[in-house]
Amino acid sequence: MQQLQNVIETAFERRADITPANVDTVTREAVNQVISLLDSGALRVAEKIDGQWVTHQWLKKAVLLSFRINDNQVIDGAESRYFDKVPMKFADYDEARFQKEGFRVVPPAAVRQGAFIARNTVLMPSYVNIGAYVDEGTMVDTWATVGSCAQIGKNVHLSGGVGIGGVLEPLQANPTIIEDNCFIGARSEVVEGVIVEEGSVISMGVYLGQSTKIYDRETGEVHYGRVPAGSVVVSGNLPSKDGKYSLYCAVIVKKVDAKTRGKVGINELLRTID
C-alpha cells in the first residue's frame, strides 16, 4: 500500500503536466487501483482510529488525479445520455451482482464509480459522488445528495432533499462525516467537514457549516464544526451583543442516549423540545 501511495504522491506533484494523452502506465494503473479500492470499500478517505477521525489525503489526491488522466466520454443511461470523466458505479452490474452486494437502488438514483455502498442500504432517487462511503443499513432518501468523499455511518437516515457536502479541494479540508445512527431531517445541509456525532437527530431545515454556531441551550456552550453525540438539533437564532439583530444558529435542545432514542420515535423527540 505504501508503494501505491508513493506513486500517487509523486504524480500529484506534477499533476499540472499530466493529460490523458501523456499519462504514464504506472500512474494510470495506480489511480485506477485506488478508485477500485474506494469503490469496493477496501479503502476509505476517512476512518475513525482510536476515537479520532483521520483523513487520508493521498486518497483525495488519487481522486483528483483521476480527473486529469481521463477524457470525457459518452455515458449511456436509461433516461438520457451523459458526458463525463467518471463512469457510473452500476454500469456493468447485472442482477446477480446486485443480489450479492445486497443494496437497493431506485431509479433514477446515480452513484459515481469510486463511491462505496454497503449492504442493506437503500438509495431512493438520489446522488452519491466519487470517494463517498455509505455504510450498512442507511437510507438515502429522495433528492438527497452525498458529496465527494463524505462519510456516512451505519443506520443513518438522510431525509428528502438533504445535502451532505463534498470536499476534494483544498486538500487540507476534511470530509463531512455523519456517524452511526444519525437522523438528518428533510432539506438540511451539512457541509464543510462538519462532523455529526453518533446518535444525533437533526431537525428539518438545519444548516451546518464550519462557521455555524451550534448552541447548547442547557450549558450555554457554543460548538463549531461538530455536533456532540446524542444531540437533538433544531434551527434557531442568537442575539447580537448590542441586541439590535439576531443571526442564524443551530440549537441543541436536548441530549438523548441510545436507550431513549430506541424507545422514542424521531418525531416525538423533535416535538417535545420545550
From Swiss-Prot:
EC numbers, comma separated: 2.3.1.117
Reaction(s) catalysed (UniProt annotation): (S)-2,3,4,5-tetrahydrodipicolinate + succinyl-CoA + H2O = (S)-2-succinylamino-6-oxoheptanedioate + CoA
Keyword vocabulary terms for this entry: Acyltransferase, Amino-acid biosynthesis, Cytoplasm, Diaminopimelate biosynthesis, Lysine biosynthesis, Repeat, Transferase
Pathway(s) it belongs to: Amino-acid biosynthesis; L-lysine biosynthesis via DAP pathway; LL-2,6-diaminopimelate from (S)-tetrahydrodipicolinate (succinylase route): step 1/3
One GO process term, biological-process aspect: lysine biosynthetic process
Keyword Transferase: yes
Database matches in CDD domains: LbH_THP_succinylT
Family per similarity comment: Belongs to the transferase hexapeptide repeat family.
Assembly information from the UniProt record: Homotrimer.
PANTHER family: 2,3,4,5-TETRAHYDROPYRIDINE-2,6-DICARBOXYLATE N-SUCCINYLTRANSFERASE, MOLYBDENUM COFACTOR GUANYLYLTRANSFERASE
Protein's recorded name: 2,3,4,5-tetrahydropyridine-2,6-dicarboxylate N-succinyltransferase
Organism: Salmonella typhimurium (strain LT2 / SGSC1412 / ATCC 700720)
